[in-house]
C-alpha cells in the first residue's frame, strides 16, 4: 500500500478575483476531511485577515481535484498516496518522502498546483473488526480471516475498491 501522508494542496492562482480576501476551503465527503478542513479554516481565520468560505463535503477525490484545477476552490487536504495513484496514475511507491517529492513535482508541472508541507500524520487503510469477534475467533492478523472470509461482509469506500493499493491490492496479497 502506498504511504498516505496528508497535506494541503492548493492553487497558485485565485479563481475568484472579485474577493481576494476570502479563501475557499473544500473537503471531501468523510469525517476526517471535515475535521482537517475546519482546522485549516480556523487557523486561517485566527492568524490572518482573510475570511474563509467553507465548501465542505464537496465530494470525492476527483471532484475536489477538478474544482481546484478550475479555480472554484483554493485548497483542500489531500493524501500523497491518493494523489500518486488516483490522480497521477502512478504505481505504488513505499517511501513517503519519495512519494511526496514525486507528487509535488508532478502536480506543479501538470496542473500548476502546489503541495504544502505534510500535516505530520500518516493515514493508511486498515481493517476493523469487533473486539468480541477478534477475541472469540483468535484473530490477530489479517491472514487469520482467510478461513472465514466467505462468511464476512466488508464495507469499503468507492475509492478504496478501485485503487490498485486498495481492495485490488488487498485481494492479491490475501487470496
Which role fits each region the language model picked out?
Residues 40-48, 142-175:
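Ligand-binding cleft/hinge of the Venus flytrap
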Residues 69-78, 149-152:
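Alpha-to-beta junction loops
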Residues 77-92, 98-105:
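A ligand-binding cleft/hinge motif common to bilobed small-molecule-binding domains
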Amino acid at each position: 500500500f502506498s504511504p498516505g501522508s496528508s497535506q494541503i494542496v492548493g492553487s497558485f492562482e485565485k479563481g475568484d478575483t472579485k474577493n481576494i480576501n476570502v479563501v475557499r476551503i473544500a473537503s471531501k465527503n468523510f469525517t476526517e476531511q471535515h475535521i482537517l478542513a475546519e482546522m485549516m479554516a480556523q487557523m486561517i481565520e485566527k492568524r490572518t485577515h482573510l475570511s474563509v468560505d467553507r465548501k465542505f463535503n464537496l465530494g470525492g477525490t476527483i471532484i475536489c481535484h477538478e474544482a481546484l484545477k478550475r479555480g472554484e476552490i483554493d485548497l483542500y487536504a489531500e493524501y500523497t498516496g491518493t494523489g500518486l495513484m488516483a490522480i497521477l496514475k502512478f504505481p505504488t511507491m513505499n517511501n513517503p518522502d519519495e512519494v511526496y517529492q514525486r507528487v509535488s513535482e508532478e502536480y506543479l508541472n501538470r496542473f500548476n498546483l502546489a503541495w504544502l508541507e505534510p500535516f505530520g500524520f500518516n493515514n493508511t487503510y486498515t481493517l476493523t473488526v469487533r473486539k468480541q469477534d477478534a477475541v472469540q475467533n483468535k484473530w490477530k492478523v489479517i491472514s487469520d480471516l482467510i478461513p472465514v472470509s466467505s462468511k464476512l461482509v466488508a464495507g469499503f469506500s468507492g475509492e478504496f475498491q478501485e485503487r490498485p493499493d486498495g481492495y485490488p491490492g488487498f485481494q492479491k496479497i490475501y487470496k
